[in-house]
């Protein structure tokens, strides 16, 4: 018996590849959430969600960077991406574990993930304003994970879709991968946005 089998006796050699497949699958299914914020920046502009209002602390509720156009555009972009990612499997291998589900399910599930990511980002902006941090200021941890928490939380509105993909069995390994890879991916995407002139800060 290989040494690692003594450490992980419940994982058979045949099951190990299946468990490892959960990592790229979780990242695959989470792509709509990953793309929501960058697309919100691309489609952003126009009236801010908070309509320019401030709270009693004198700080804006969210700030000018959070707009209705960005919220709608980012959500739709993520929904369309999920639909496009799923179409090849729907046509060639409907029962594939990589499929988002039938077209309607793929669109709705991806929209929920994307909207959750953007709502999580809104909560992050709200917290930063309460901390008197200006728009674009760094808030380690909050900046990297607000959208992840928001997307995963809202995805529980459709548990039949989200639980087997993120919250049970081997999918938990994929969830861990999302948590680990997010800071580096977040940094890379923001750097690209900065180079393209879409963001004022490279973080």
Question: Where do the PLM segments sit?
Answer:
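Interhelical loop and helix-boundary elements at the membrane-water interface
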Residues: 2-154, 165-203
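Transmembrane helix-loop junctions at the membrane interface of multipass transporters and ion channels
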Residues: 158-164
